[in-house]
């Protein structure tokens, strides 16, 4: 693709995303399905703006690559060892069982047994990009079902290596083309990457960070991710697996959070590009001529994978309310099928339109997942939040609460218990099914659902409530809720949890003045105790704590992100000097009088 064509394609991609995703969100079908529909619209079978789908699809795999790097950063070798049972137990069982059943069905559909085996393995894989995105949207990341889902996806990525090696063997070209020496060299190169990364990455990033130039650090991060992907691709292995390993090697480093921040903007854009490319690859011509075959294949694929996953989740001990979410989020075909089927086609394993039919099936199955998740979400909401008497029954009992608490994790539980102890009428909304079930056993009135949906807030009593307390784990969810409340329920008094200064600035800019930084108060209290342990009078330590709190809040309001770094540094130094002067005056005053105790907040 030439430079001008690449620029035109970039503009078309951005326009399609900007137009389709907000529309999809308004319709409630999710961003992923919006990207897929946008791809269909601008692809060769839609308006025909872009025809070179294969090249763009290969480039767009970088979205999955960046996503896997960030996932690797969130894990460490000890955590992977803890997940070994779910990775090599449930993950292996899912791939083998699904592949065996699907391969048998493909043989009944007149596929050669070699092609059926490859087809079964490819269809057994799920979409890492789609599943992880949906799990994040549905708040499954921290749940038991989400952890198990990640383990299954990780095993599928690991299975890429033997699956690709199996293709030439099935094609009967092992003696002519399959070079075991090359395989051994690939394994050796892979081992060198592991060992080199283990001992070299930290010193390299320490040297780069010492320069103090953030742009260079970002460039080094991109270089690491792209180099790992290119290296694995040259070996004929999964690019995503290579960057995942690089992330794991850096998971325990002091640069973990900075690396994640540097990559995050690129990940989101490239993931969107990946889903658009998948939509573009949908061959509507094959769909039109084999409509019944494709429709039946999609249904059979989704049902078989859901049944397999549901059974494994039950054997693993996942709660019944979480099994359907786990089974549905992994029910689609995945991006690995495109790679595996292309390799098999080059070995002439498929006949006629067989490869095209399989690819259309995979693409359409990916489009069913967001809709399936939405339907299961509604079913779970009604099931967990009370029996359904008629179609108009709200998801949440409307008992006209005074306060709505969103999120019932450790942070939200303390707030809810305090409010209930003071006889306040509250409604708690939580999207982690496991947490809902557990808290209900203890007698808490917790309801399942995604609070970023206006309908759920309305049925929870937002129109009659006085306040809403937002304690979401994800800052994006917090800001989305703030926007929804300001737009649809402007009378609500909004109180929110901020994970740090960045989130606090965002809340202030959105007009939310009542918030709490989750570690700030506890850190101040421990600091006060430290001052007392060093010999300071308790009254003086208390006043020091209060002065620090007030000055820090004032700085938070003044040092908004628009200021330059130099202005922020200058103002921070000025504030530190001001704080020291206040403490000096307090010291002199306390020496004169330490009898009385002032009223403190």
Swiss-Prot record:
Task: Kindly state one GO CC term assigned in the UniProt record.
Answer: plasma membrane
Where does the chain cross the membrane? 4-24, 29-49, 55-75, 87-107, 111-131, 152-172, 177-197, 207-227, 230-250, 262-282, 284-304, 324-344, 356-376
Subcellular compartments? Cell inner membrane
The GO annotation for biological process reads: proton transmembrane transport
Would the keyword Cell membrane turn up in this protein's UniProt record?
A: yes
Give any Pfam family that matches: Na_H_Exchanger
Its membrane topology is listed as:
Multi-pass membrane protein
* Record-linked Gene3D superfamilies: 1.20.1530.20, NAD(P)-binding Rossmann-like Domain (3.40.50.720)
RCK N-terminal domain: residues covered: 400-519
User: What are the entry keywords?
Assistant: Antiport, Cell inner membrane, Cell membrane, Ion transport, Membrane, Potassium, Potassium transport, Transmembrane, Transmembrane helix, Transport
Question: In terms of one coarse class, where is the protein primarily found?
Answer: membrane
Record's keyword annotation contains Nucleus: no
Task: Outline what the protein does.
Answer: Pore-forming subunit of a potassium efflux system that confers protection against electrophiles. Catalyzes K(+)/H(+) antiport.
Recorded hits in HAMAP family, A to Z, give: K_H_efflux_KefB
The subunit structure is: Interacts with the regulatory subunit KefG.
As for family, the record states: Belongs to the monovalent cation:proton antiporter 2 (CPA2) transporter (TC 2.A.37) family. KefB subfamily.
Q: What is this protein called?
A: Glutathione-regulated potassium-efflux system protein KefB
Gene it is expressed from? kefB
């Amino acid at each position: 693709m030439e430079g001008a064509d690449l620029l035109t394609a970039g503009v078309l991609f951005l326009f399609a995303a900007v137009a389709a995703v907000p529309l999809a969100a308004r319709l409630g079908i999710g961003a992923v399905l919006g990207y897929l529909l946008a791809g269909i619209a601008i692809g060769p079978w839609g308006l025909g703006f872009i025809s070179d789908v294969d090249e763009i699809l290969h480039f767009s795999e970088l979205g999955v690559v960046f996503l896997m790097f960030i996932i690797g950063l969130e894990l460490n070798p000890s955590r992977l060892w803890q997940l070994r049972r779910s990775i090599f137990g449930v993950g292996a069982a899912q791939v083998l069982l699904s592949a065996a059943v699907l391969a048998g069905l493909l043989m009944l559909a007149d596929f050669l047994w070699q092609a059926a085996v490859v087809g079964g393995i490819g269809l057994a894989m799920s979409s890492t990009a789609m599943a992880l995105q949906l799990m994040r949207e549905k708040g499954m990341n921290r749940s038991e079902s989400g952890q198990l889902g990640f383990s299954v996806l990780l095993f599928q990525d690991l299975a890429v290596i033997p699956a690709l090696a199996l293709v030439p063997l099935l094609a009967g070209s092992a003696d002519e083309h399959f070079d075991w020496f090359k395989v051994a060299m690939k394994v050796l190169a892979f081992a060198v990457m592991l060992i080199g990364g283990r001992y070299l990455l930290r010193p390299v990033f320490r040297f780069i960070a010492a320069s103090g130039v953030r742009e260079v650090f970002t460039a080094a991060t991109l270089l690491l991710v792209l180099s790992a992907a290119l290296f694995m691709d040259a070996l004929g292995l999964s690019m995503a697996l290579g960057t995942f390993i690089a992330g794991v090697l850096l998971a325990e480093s002091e640069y973990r959070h900075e690396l994640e921040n540097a990559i995050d903007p690129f990940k989101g854009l490239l993931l969107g590009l990946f889903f658009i490319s998948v939509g573009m690859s949908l061959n509507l011509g094959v769909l039109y001529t084999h409509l019944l075959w494709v429709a039946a294949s999609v249904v059979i694929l989704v049902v078989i994978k859901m049944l397999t996953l549901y059974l494994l989740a039950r054997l693993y001990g996942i709660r019944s309310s979480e099994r359907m979410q786990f089974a549905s989020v992994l029910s689609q075909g995945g991006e690995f099928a495109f790679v595996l089927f292309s390799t098999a086609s080059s070995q002439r394993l498929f006949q006629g339109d067989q490869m095209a039919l399989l690819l259309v099936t995979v693409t359409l199955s990916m489009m069913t997942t967001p809709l399936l998740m939405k339907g299961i979400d509604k079913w779970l909401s009604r099931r967990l939040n009370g029996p359904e008497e008629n179609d108009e029954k709200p998801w949440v009992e409307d008992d006209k609460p005074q306060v709505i608490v969103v999120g019932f994790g450790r942070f939200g539980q303390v707030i809810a218990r305090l409010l209930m102890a003071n006889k306040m009428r509250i409604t708690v909304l939580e999207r982690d099914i496991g947490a809902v079930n557990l808290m209900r056993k203890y007698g808490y009135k917790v309801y399942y659902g995604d609070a970023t949906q206006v309908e759920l807030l309305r049925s929870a009593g937002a129109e009659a409530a006085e306040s809403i307390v937002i304690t979401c784990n994800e800052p994006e969810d917090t800001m989305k809720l703030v926007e929804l409340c300001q737009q649809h329920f402007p009378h609500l008094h909004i109180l929110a949890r901020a994970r740090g200064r960045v989130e606090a600035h965002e809340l202030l800019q959105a007009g939310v003045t009542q918030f709490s930084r989750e570690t700030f108060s506890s850190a101040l209290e421990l600091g006060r105790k430290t001052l007392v342990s060093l010999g300071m009078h308790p009254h003086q330590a208390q006043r020091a704590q209060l002065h620090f709190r007030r000055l820090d809040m004032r700085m938070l309001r003044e040092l908004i992100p628009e200021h330059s770094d130099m202005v922020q540094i200058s103002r921070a130094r000025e504030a530190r000097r001001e704080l020291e002067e206040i403490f000096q005056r307090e010291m002199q005053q306390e020496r004169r009088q330490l009898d009385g105790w002032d009223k403190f907040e």
